[in-house]
A protein has these predicted regions:
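Acidic-aromatic substrate-binding/catalytic surfaces of carbohydrate-active enzymes
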Residues: 1-21
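Short, basic/aromatic beta-hairpin or loop at an interaction surface
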Residues: 1-4, 210-222
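Extended, loop-rich substrate-binding clefts of extracytoplasmic carbohydrate-active enzymes
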Residues: 22-77
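Beta-strand-rich interaction surfaces with strong enrichment in secreted/lumenal proteins
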Residues: 70-72, 229-234
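Active-site/ligand-binding surface loops and adjacent short beta/alpha elements
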Residues: 103-106, 110-190
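Glycine-rich active-site loops that engage anionic ligands at enzyme catalytic sites
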Residues: 178-217
């Protein structure tokens, strides 16, 4: 089963689930292959766990690059820090996308009744909600769902048209709150991540808050991998690291 999967080497869907790399067509399914692969334990301490995924024949058949992907968790009191590091171990430039997909337990009845909401730490007047067409990013923006430039109301119909994907967030701090209990459930800080995805499966006892470096293909995508918007490109030997944190409240 998937538990807090890492999205790599893509986030979201590719047009026709295919992409072109160096003139050859490859198939990569939604959110990439890393989320379905077993990572090797590297370090296990009481408050620090680190895991590693290395390229192999399976990944090379879908993504012809040499890499190491580290997934690390560090606990500090009631805060959990997620750290992702990608290293280009090959001899050519390596483009990729990266994202987190952690899920957090909620009461599905409270979601159904509209008791949950998300609140940014400050007013956000430059945000845009991406509009998805069969999982691909459309040419127009979706309706802005922010109330008073700060609050996103949540209920059982919030995700009828797939995930909410927000870009242009200035203050990268958001809290999940419950109006019935008048409590803050958690606060996420995601500085350095251009996008935030929000999603829940109908009737599920969880909600996903997903910091992303990139998004799905556009509906008019050329399918050429290096032409995807927001790709991170590492030169041989270079590495990229990004982190976010979640603070939990009783």
């Amino acid at each position: 089963k998937r538990h807090s999967p890492v999205l790599f080497p893509i986030v979201g869907k590719l047009k026709r689930n295919q992409t072109i790399i160096n003139g050859r067509t490859y198939e990569i399914r939604q959110h990439g292959f890393a989320r379905d692969m077993e990572f090797e334990p590297v370090t296990k301490l009481d408050n620090f766990h680190s895991y590693l995924l290395k390229c192999n024949k399976y990944t090379q058949a879908r993504y012809p690059f040499d890499f190491e992907l580290y997934n690390t968790y560090r606990q500090e009191a009631n805060k959990l820090i997620f750290i992702y590091k990608v290293i280009n171990t090959g001899v050519t430039n390596m483009p990729f996308g990266l994202g987190g997909h952690p899920a957090f337990k909620i009461d599905p009845d409270d979601l159904k009744r509209g008791n949950y909401y998300l609140e940014f730490a400050e007013e956000e007047d430059r945000t845009h909600f991406l509009y998805l067409v069969d999982g691909l990013v459309g040419t127009e923006y979706a309706k802005n769902k922010l109330i008073n430039n700060r609050i996103i109301a949540l209920d059982e119909h919030t995700f009828d048209n797939d995930a909410l994907i927000i870009k242009g967030i200035q203050n990268k701090k958001i809290s999940l709150k419950n109006s019935r209990t008048r409590k803050t459930v958690l606060t996420m800080e995601f500085d350095g991540w251009p996008y935030l995805g929000i999603w829940s499966k109908p009737g599920a006892p969880f909600i996903c808050l997903e910091p992303w470096q990139s998004t799905a293909d556009r509906i008019h995508s050329s399918n050429v991998f290096v032409q995807k918007p927001d790709m991170i490109v590492l030169e041989p030997g270079q590495e990229f690291e990004a982190k976010f944190s979640v603070q939990f409240f009783n």
